[in-house]
Amino acid sequence: MNSFLLNRQLGSVSPQALAQAQNQHLLQALQAPYNVHFSQVGLGEHEVIDAAYQPPVAHAAGVNSIAIDRFEGRYLLSGGADSSVAIWDLERSESNTDGAVLHLPLGHAAKTSTTGRLGITRVSFYPFDSLAFLTSGYDRTLKLFDSETLSASATFDLESTVHAHATSTVATHLLVACASQHPAVRLVDLRTGSSTHSLAGHSGSVLSVAWHPKNEHTLASGATDGTCRSWDVRRSASSLGVLDMDDSIGIVGYDGKGLGSRRRERGQAHNGAVNGLTWSEDGQFLVTTGTDKRMRVFDMSTGAHLLANFGPALENSHNTTLTPLMPPSMYSHTRTIYYPNAGEILCFEMQSGSLQKRLRVPQSVPRANHIHQKLNRTTSLAWRAHHIEMYSSHADGTIRCWRPRTAEDAEAEEEGFAADETAQTASAERKRKRDELNQIVQGLTKRREM
């Protein structure tokens, strides 16, 4: 970095190159701070958190999904496996003398399901206003909530378990795409309240859906039949095409919108269920994950499989949504993918598939009265807008923050600790001298009295 600063002063590199190099440096330095926690219960001033033994939990039954508002990057929404939801202010926290930073919920609803404590599968903020949010769950419903009162303002019964939902951030419509046990993708119109429109084509339960980041009418879906389909929601016909993991060439003349020379009707994206979809920021690539423990990248202009090999480290065996995360492209000169693995988060370079870093999730030791140790499985990832920060949710009920900690930060902390230790030593020495002086004065006073 010092060489970049020198070259910037000499004018040999642009300010943009310097900023991107610094952002890349910070991106590679992400790690979980030991003293940042999310908890439903506050701490006393002198209470100590033993995170290595049992960290505070945000949801006692586990956290299934999190989301961060894309406008301010300030509010985090979490949904629990017991149908509870909570909203957290990332800029407001409590601290104690031990140095622990504790986030407490701004609002918390212990139960959102009317048919028992059936877990939430997905939470998301309303795409154009963070004062409302959506939830889907095992109670077969999609719900629209008020962020201030945490009360449901609308409920849509889809008559089958809703594995995930997605909203478009660029659309003029208010369609919510829902992935459910039904083989058709259900579209719910928040403007009219209808949920009759569906996209038929899959032969198994739909597990994941994702809207194109640039085209408001293009949608991708993945299902248990191993297929990944793209759709134009304005068309009543079949899907635009199917992605094929065995095709590394693609369809010449195909524009990804159902037009061109031809479209593919058969093919599989994975040998197992497709349970995760993520578009690149420009919409050129689609990243898919499957229960065959593979992650694949497709060029959506041709449908070609890029053949990026992400190695054997991926864990994915549950028929639940497991979505990788791609940070904003301005932070890196290469496309980066974060994969929520068991007990860790893996960082990959997208086009080559090379593993860049493992972000280890701090392990906790279960208490003696815990009969079963909860899995420390990563269930969801969310990027904080306007910051180089990532947040992860876990099946053990914790929410973790990932921030850059560079070598310069470590040196500054060591210098701070050394300064504190020196100050404590000097203070102890001054106290010793005061005590000795007081003893001398007391001795002289006693002699005079005698």
Language model features: what each stretch is:
Residues 2-41, 250-256, 309-450:
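Terminal intrinsically disordered, low-complexity extensions flanking WD-repeat/beta-propeller proteins
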Residues 57, 94-125:
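Blade-loop segments of beta-propeller domains
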Residues 67-73, 124-130, 166-173, 203, ...:
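Loop/turn segments within WD40 beta-propeller blades
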